[in-house]
């Protein structure tokens, strides 16, 4: 509402929510919404999408052949072709489509319930450990199934490397494409370690991760 009153485009980054929560762009009155395919949508890397409300004009970042209106010497202006220069990632899009079919068959509510259960199990297991600082509001009813934390003053990359090399646990360290948030948290230099839970994960795997953090905290 504020953006509309000030004639500002309302742009939503749904990278962490697409496939986790239902999104109604009409109800949210979104002008532009972007999402990646390889996170909650379970699709291949290198896929994603952009919703653009009718009437919103976007200048193409890239121009080139599209296989549409070939004899026109100018880049197509009609949507979505205007934003799809070059050969599309057909096999990636097919994989993303198959993943979305799977989500629809299984139900994102069912998937989200398990992911949040695993997330809370992990949070409960590490949040009270000394020298472990967890970021985020875990009392919120609606949140992504991720846990981001730091261990003492250790660089997040060192913690992530240790988890990978010693315990075989893959995590994401660093700034997570959110530099302004890390400025607000005061973690620009340290970054943070992020666990992202999938409904393919098990409680046993979560417990293994908790034990790993406990052991690293004891070494700290």
Where does each model-flagged region fall?
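Pyridoxal 5′-phosphate
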Residues: 1-220
């Amino acid at each position: 509402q504020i953006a509309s009153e000030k004639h500002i485009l309302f742009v939503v980054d749904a990278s962490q929510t697409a496939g986790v929560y239902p999104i109604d762009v009409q109800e949210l009155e979104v002008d532009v919404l972007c999402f990646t395919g390889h996170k909650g949508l379970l699709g291949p890397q290198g896929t994603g999408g952009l919703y653009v409300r009718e009437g919103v004009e976007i200048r193409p970042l890239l121009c080139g052949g599209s296989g549409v209106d070939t004899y026109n010497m100018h880049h197509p202006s009609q949507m979505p072709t205007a934003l799809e220069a070059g050969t599309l990632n057909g096999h990636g899009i097919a994989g993303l489509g198959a993943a979305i079919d799977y989500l629809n068959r299984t139900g994102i509510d069912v998937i989200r319930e398990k992911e949040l259960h695993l997330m809370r199990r992990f949070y409960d297991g590490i949040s009270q450990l000394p020298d472990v600082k967890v970021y985020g509001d875990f009392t919120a009813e609606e949140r992504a199934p991720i846990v981001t934390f730091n261990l003492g003053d250790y660089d997040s990359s060192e913690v992530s490397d240790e988890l990978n090399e010693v315990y075989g646990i893959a995590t994401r360290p660093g700034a997570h494409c959110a530099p302004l948030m890390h400025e607000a948290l005061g973690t620009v230099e340290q970054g943070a370690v992020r666990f992202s839970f999938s409904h393919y994960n098990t409680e046993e795997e979560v417990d293994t991760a908790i034990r790993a953090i406990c052991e690293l905290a004891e070494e700290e």
